[in-house]
Amino acid sequence: MKKQNIISPLLFGIAMCIATISNAQSPVSPVKKGSVTFMAGVGIGNEYNSNYYNQALGTKAALEVGLWQAGPGVITLGVQAGGTFSNGGGAFNNYKAHTLIIAGRSAWHHGWNVKGLDTYAGLSAGAGFNQYSYNQNENRFKQNEVMPVFGGFVGASYFVTPSFGFNVEAGRDITQIQGGIILKIK
């Protein structure tokens, strides 16, 4: 009688472990052909025109659509917008520089057969609206400039639910490195 009471829960436990392991190992790449994702993050901003005084703060948001299957991954096209902001210190306490950017972006996404994981690399190109200003004695200097901006980036996202996850991205883009969230809209 005692043997029967132990065997049933033991078999049930083994069956649950096998089901959990097999479900956790099923490859589900979050970014597929036809999917739409939105990401937003904050981090260290890139310095445009070398006119930043301190390390710039950067923020970026991007919207991507999965368009083409390319080998084991998906190629996406999208748009991104963001900015980098720097304020001076010391002798240049009134020095300010910022660049606002709007650009197109494309990336190749691959999930590595790990549920919820998305890694990617891509390129961006667009326009940057740069402004810096400072005071010198009684005079206020200000310069505005529109410039082409090009970037390259690598990143990874991990979806904790089918539609929400966390994202990190690094490269020579609007931000050098950033952390944020990602939403799968479709």
Kindly label every feature range from the protein language model.
Residues H109-D118, G128-K186:
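Gram-negative outer-membrane beta-barrel domains
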